[in-house]
Amino acid sequence: MYLNTFCKNELICGNTMRTMIKYLRQELKMSQKELGDKVGVTRQTINALENGRYNPSLFLAYEITQVFNKMMFKGDREKYFFMEEIFIFDDDYY
């Protein structure tokens, strides 16, 4: 089952976890290094995650959801979706 419940952008709906992470990171004008610093990993790890060369641990996945959920509260939450949905419902991930 792909995420589409909260997604308002047809181009983004149905994409995989890595695409969603990259999309949100870029929407928030955050570099890979900045995201890595916030979750305690290197820029290279974020790059590998976004390019499908690395599957995050449950802990890292949780940390990423916390960063994006906090950031989304500062803006228009309606145009985003909950990051937890990506990790729970992304069939390509499992």
Predicted region positions:
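Residue-level detection of the helix-turn-helix DNA-binding "recognition helix"
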Residues: 22, 26, 40, 51
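Hydrophobic micro-packing sites on short alpha-helices
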Residues: 61-68
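Short, charged recognition helix plus adjacent turn
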Residues: 1-13, 66, 73-94
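Short basic helix-loop element that most often maps to the first helix and adjoining turn
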Residues: 19-34, 63
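Short, leucine-enriched amphipathic alpha-helices that occur as contiguous helical runs
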Residues: 14-18
